[in-house]
Structure formats: structure tokens, C-alpha cells
Amino acid sequence: VTDAMRATYAPTGVEFAITNSGGLRADLTCPTTDNPSDFCPAYTPPPYPITRGQVLTVLPFGNIVTTVTISGAELKTMLENGVSRMPAVDGRFPQVSGLCFTYDIALLAGSRVLSAFETDSTGNCTATPVDLTATSSYKIAENDFMTGGGDGYPVFSSRATTQDIMDQVTADYITANSPISPFVKAFPDGRINCADSNGAAAPNCPALTASP
């Protein structure tokens, strides 16, 4: 979803995309056993068709993409908010595109983000750092729920630009880029990496598996 947001608005200068996990209500993979109550087509081995109904199951709220230019410090505030409730399961946890970052789950909420780096065209982390200070600025895409302060994210309503409905943005991206992979890489090459400075004494990082 965030890849779709970033790619769609990259021509307008968008560098990163962030959405809250609570807005993603399903995934785009289908079970091997057919279920007439879901939106999956009859099962075939991957790559398999993705239906409009599946996209709407993932994004059922009708959220709209917004774009806004923020400072690096504001971006850090967003990332800090996103991991502030970890290891608890919380809808504010961010899904990102265009950047990868590392946070220390043992540190106090608000001071957990250690570093962030840009990703390349394939989604791999690069050595190019993201400047998380007030002296830098980045244009991002997010959803209108977050823009209005939902899930504790900073309020950017007064300076954000309203774009298109997220489900349509995602559907158009899938159509243009199929076949697509349903997974992103896990630690240590993933977009969001958890460190635990308490080590074995407090193994609170999530399981190191790939995510949809």
C-alpha cells in the first residue's frame, strides 16, 4: 500500500510514504481452500488474480491519500509515535516506503528511533541517511486519518494536499505493476528493524519474519 502511495505521487516530489497498520484490515494473499464468503477467485498457484473486492477488504475505510512537506524532526516524531507502543500490538505501528529505520525497543517511548536510511528502487536499504532534524525537509504521502491526528500522529491538516482514495491508488498500482510480491524483507534488511539494548534480558522485539 505504501509503495503504491509513494510511486503514485513521486512525480509531485513525494519521497516517503507512511500509513498506520490499523488501517490495513487484511492482506492480499488468498487461502489454498476456496471460501465462497471471501473475495478471492478460485485458488490457483501464485501468481494468482487479485480482485477489487480483496483491495477493499484491505482498505475498507475509504481513506484518502494526502501529501505534505514536513521537516526531518517531524518525520522522526511520526516514526517515534509509530513504535511508541511496541511490543504491544497497536494500530499506530507504521508501514513505510522509501525509507528504512531502526528503533530500540528498550528505550523510552519518544526516544527509540536510532537511525533512518533511504531505500533504493528495489526497496533495499541504502547507506544514504535520512536527516531526522529540523534543518531538513521531505515530502511524504500518508492517509487523511493520520493527517488529522489519528492514532497520535502529528496534525498536518492545515498544510496537507488532498489526493485520491487509497483503495483506488492501490488498485491502480497493482494493475500497473503485476505480478507483485506480497512480502517485504525481514530484519536485518527490512524496512523496520527492531533492536533491543537489553539483549537476552528483555527479548521484546517481534519475531523476525517477513511481513505483508
Predicted regions and their residues:
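Catalytic centers of hydrolytic enzymes
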Residues: 1-212
